[in-house]
């Protein structure tokens, strides 16, 4: 199965199986890569835009009342433009430019930035009508569902002052 690629490895099946699926209003693509030096999601957004959008469509097919929102920090204008073009003809998806600041990509902050709904530490995103997945997870969903390719790899950034040849691998 697919696990979340944001770091915790949470099973995507569980995330996509809320107790009240009809109350899910937002599927938020966490495209806010706010940590210094990290650019893996940025490159994936640029190079695999169609796969990213396709992964969102797969999730939206499970939640007929939901809208898909690609939440991208405003310092990634090229990604914003490319995603806007990719979703221009789809009335259920849009792109939201977020202020570039840390920790914009943290789930609770991201939900608030997109929906203005605050969730406390006892709540899950579904309690606020949201499901949040990151770039790599959405591309993994596309690869698994559309291409039949299992999720067995991910792109990571290796960078910093001590790295001789930084890059995304």
What is the role of each PLM region?
Residues 2-17:
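Conserved phosphate/anionic-ligand binding catalytic regions in large, soluble enzymes, centered on
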Residues 3, 25, 66:
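Short acidic/polar active-site loop segments enriched in Thr and Asp
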Residues 4, 27-41, 162:
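Gly-rich Lys/Arg/Thr-decorated short loops/hinges at beta-loop-alpha junctions or inter-strand turns
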Residues 13, 37-39, 106, 166-167:
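Short helix/loop capping segments that flank catalytic or ligand/cofactor-binding pockets
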Residues 14-34:
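Short, compositionally biased "basic patch" segments
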Residues 40-47, 74:
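Alpha-helix capping and helix-loop boundary segments enriched in small/acidic/polar residues
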Residues 46-62:
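Histidine-anchored nucleotide/phosphate-binding helix
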Residues 66-169:
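Hydrophobic alpha-helical positions that pack around
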């Amino acid at each position: 199965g697919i696990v979340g690629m944001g770091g915790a490895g949470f099973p995507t099946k569980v995330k996509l199986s809320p107790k009240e699926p009809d109350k899910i209003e937002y599927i938020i693509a966490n495209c806010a890569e706010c940590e210094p030096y990290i650019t893996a999601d940025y490159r994936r957004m640029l190079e695999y835009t169609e796969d990213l959008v396709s992964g969102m469509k797969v999730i939206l097919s499970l939640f007929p009342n939901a809208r898909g929102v690609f939440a991208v920090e405003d310092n990634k204008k090229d990604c914003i433009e490319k995603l806007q073009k990719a979703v221009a003809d789809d009335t259920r998806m849009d792109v939201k430019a977020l202020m570039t600041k840390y920790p914009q990509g943290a789930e609770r902050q991201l939900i608030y930035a997109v929906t203005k709904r605050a969730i406390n530490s006892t709540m899950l995103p579904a309690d606020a009508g949201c499901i949040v997945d990151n770039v790599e997870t959405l591309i993994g969903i596309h690869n698994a569902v559309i291409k039949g390719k299992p999720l067995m790899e991910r792109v990571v950034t290796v960078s910093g002052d001590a790295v001789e040849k930084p890059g995304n691998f």
